[in-house]
Amino acid sequence: MVTNKDNFCVIMGGGIGSRFWPFSRKTLPKQFLDFFGTGRSLLQQTFDRFKQVIPMENILIVTNDLYADLVKEQLPELKPEQILLEPTRRNTAPCIAWASYHICALNPNANIVVAPSDHLILKEGEFLAAIEKGLDFVSQSDNLLTLGIKPNRPETGYGYIQIAEAAGDNFYKVKTFTEKPELELAKVFVESGEFYWNSGLFMWNVNTIIKANEALLPELTSKLAPGKDVYGTVQEKQFIDENFPACPNVSIDFGIMEKADNVYVSLGDFGWSDLGTWGSLYDLSPKDEAGNVALKCKSLIYNSKDNIVVLPDNKLAVIDGLEGYLIAESDNVLLICKKDEEHTIRKYVNDRSEERRVG
């Protein structure tokens, strides 16, 4: 199935995943965890997926220095030069810009798919066909492409893409991007039929994204473009360590996709989910007749419904009379909170960090 040596994949794997605390922590973020007991972490599943359509030697992992050993342990088939290690976190635009310069040094004709490391894809065959079709689209045009997912509910945790006129077989010009709307607006979006979820998956030719960075993110370009003679060499890491921390902290959505006038979307339904929250994990997990989820743990549940329980496999959870709760334990932390209040988890993480600092 893998044929085109000009096709590359960049997997972004440097996030902390604080919304999945206490399981996902700075020392072991969610992309390195196996949530469903498959024997493969989210990162490994993402790699397994893309190596079916991208030459394995053309797959890059961009992550933080902290996770170098984790990536090497989970993906031992990668060569050291396929793992790009950021000295500090600077959001997705600098991450993608660096990977683009690196790839351009290897292959100035490269077509690139950029993907997060924590997505779940249930309809893999349809997804991979869309990736190949999208890479072909960007190889023949100076356009930036994203994948749009048909929404099945008014989700407030995703960004939305409004489509304009068609530009070929299932490709549409993007009219607007909207970041994580309130519930009422999300309902309007879904009912209109014009809006699709923003998957966070992108495709483009390497020269197209470099030109977009030059035009829309000149401050970022000024930090990374001077390294064009060292990308792909042994001097690259030193250059990045010295210059990457000075890059602006900006997302690819805000910095490029919302501002460029050559953005298109390919629409699909791949059984896609951004596994970003406990709520999304609950939605995807098998449930008992009362809507309770118990992941990889023993449980006795009475008079309760719509809960998610995630404990170490040597613990037994006995639950009576709860509705709509998250019960999660990892290491020395037990978290119990309303499932629909999980947006406060980042506050708990900050409070825990402050307690440790003061203590």
How should these model regions be labeled?
Residues 11-13, 62, 113-116, 146-150, ...:
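Short beta-strand segments
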Residues 124-244, 264, 314, 355:
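Conserved core of the sugar-phosphate nucleotidyltransferase
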Residues 1-6, 207-357:
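Left-handed beta-helix
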Residues 43, 99, 118, 161, ...:
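Residue-level signal for inorganic ion chemistry
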Residues 112, 194, 201-202, 273, ...:
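A residue-level structural signature of the nucleotidyltransferase/glycosyltransferase Rossmann-like core
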Residues 1-11, 19-26, 37-116, 122-132:
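Conserved N-terminal catalytic core of the sugar/cofactor nucleotidyltransferase
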